[in-house]
Amino acid sequence: MSYEKLLERFLTYVKINTRSNPNSTQTPTTQSQVDFALTVLKPEMEAIGLKDVHYLPSNGYLVGTLPATSDRLRHKIGFISHMDTADFNAENITPQIVDYKGGDIELGDSGYILSPKDFPNLNNYHGQTLITTDGKTLLGADDKSGIAEIMTAMEYLASHPEIEHCEIRVGFGPDEEIGIGADKFDVKDFDVDFAYTVDGGPLGELQYETFSAAGLELTFEGRNVHPGTAKNQMINALQLAMDFHSQLPENERPEQTDDYQGFYHLYDLSGTVDQAKSSYIIRDFEEVDFLKRKQLAQDIADNMNEALQSERVKVKLYDQYYNMKKVIEKDMTPINIAKEVMEELDIKPIIEPIRGGTDGSKISFMGIPTPNLFAGGENMHGRFEFVSLQTMEKAVDVILGIVAKD
């Protein structure tokens, strides 16, 4: 089904810079997310007929309710999307609307080309309306497509009171892209039987498995001596960082893994001879493999310290989130409902693990099973991001179908 305001709504949202800040200790981490919630989304939610619309300063979530129109439908269902965008330029986003007929797409005057040679997924969108960047920013379909889809579905239901649906809660939250958005999620306030994050990618994605995730921060303490007289005296902290990295399995990196394979990812390295720091993320699906990965990192550091006869490798290892499969597989109702709706709409469900995490990973372990639905974005987190309007429309269709199921 086509929805009159869906594209307009999406374009309005993405033009607002809501990039999160990993270095901030505030909640949300940027004022722009607060402003987006209070000056754009909250008035719109109230205007379309949502009730009890309220912003929670304690966690940065904007929440509203669409009351049920049927006593027959017993479930209370939530839909959640995040307001922030990823760590890429989000200032002066200028979307392009392209009626795609194949071939390359010039991204404004940036000199960048969105080409099916580099991104074969473009070949899935011949004849569709694509929204792209101008090559200078990301787009923000992750996850403003999800927000636009949820809002459009709620507006449709509010304007069609004859449609039977269950009680619906809507939540728009902050800071998902930096992994802390759901840390303070208020389960009691949201009060649903189960929920969905609308934060997935291509048409049909339906996901209830995520990585289990840990962060690893290492500090290497060296001893700087003039290199001309350094023999048996200098300890080069940068070399220690390299030595640590070389002991990790070289084929277990993001660029060499897929499907259910885990990895170690070195994403930051800095320092001098005197001190160096490296930061990793550790990811795996099965609990036993996740524990083994963390233990290997600790063992390497311990062995290096033993060889150096002092604690020159300092380890900070902490869990970030866990595979929500452990929660959701206890009751597959939200998966079964979404799958049934997709099949009724002639959408093929793509049930695959997320090689990442969602807010649903944490929310599921807080007590609300929260799998992930497609929102349409492709090539997310950069200048080559795009989304199909037709896929967004189908996401709205799926939301409408879910809330009408018993």
From Swiss-Prot:
Cofactor: Zn(2+)
InterPro entries: ArgE/DapE_CS, Bact_exopeptidase_dim_dom, Peptidase_M20, Peptidase_M20_dimer, Peptidase_M20B
UniProt entry keywords in alphabetical sequence: Aminopeptidase, Cytoplasm, Hydrolase, Metal-binding, Metalloprotease, Protease, Zinc
E.C. code: 3.4.11.4
Enzyme class: hydrolase
Residues that bind Zn(2+) 2: D142, E177, H381
Similarity-based family: Belongs to the peptidase M20B family.
Protein name (database record): Peptidase T
Organism: Streptococcus agalactiae serotype Ia (strain ATCC 27591 / A909 / CDC SS700)
Gene: pepT
